């Protein structure tokens, strides 16, 4: 990745695994660098060239020259590289469901938001059978403010990137501090709205 100046070099089959693998291996900043790559190939390259959907080719249209890619393979609404959406939801917003039967279907919610790169904020929601989950964070001058809502009849386990619980201030909600291990502060949440400040 570094030899290619933080450009992608995988195809349709590898793209869905790349950012999650980097995150899992502790290379989240590198994953953010790939997300924020403005050159070709890269997700923002398409956006800079006018994309509002995921294109089949990174260079389906080049705004500066007004040219289109090979018309035999040039869909402007093609999921192939769309796995970035899953990474944004599961990693940047941190919205996940449990894998055990009693946790599935968002009965038990796992929130593991992650910030990095040049992103200054992230905000999203997930509709579930129990109601809407929201997750958002914003970088402030010397802190990060994280907000979430947990729907009725569910519980959530929140893991915030923080050195310990002392670096996390609860601004809204009655979160119960759980553990703090290796740069992560954990909390147990019931339905309601919560706001945290991480210093």
Where do the language-model regions lie?
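Solvent-exposed loop and edge beta-strand segments that line ligand/cofactor-binding
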Residues: 1-15, 67-78
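Conserved small-residue packing positions in alpha-helical repeats and bundles
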Residues: 18-19
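Non-catalytic C-terminal accessory modules of carbohydrate-active enzymes
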Residues: 29-199
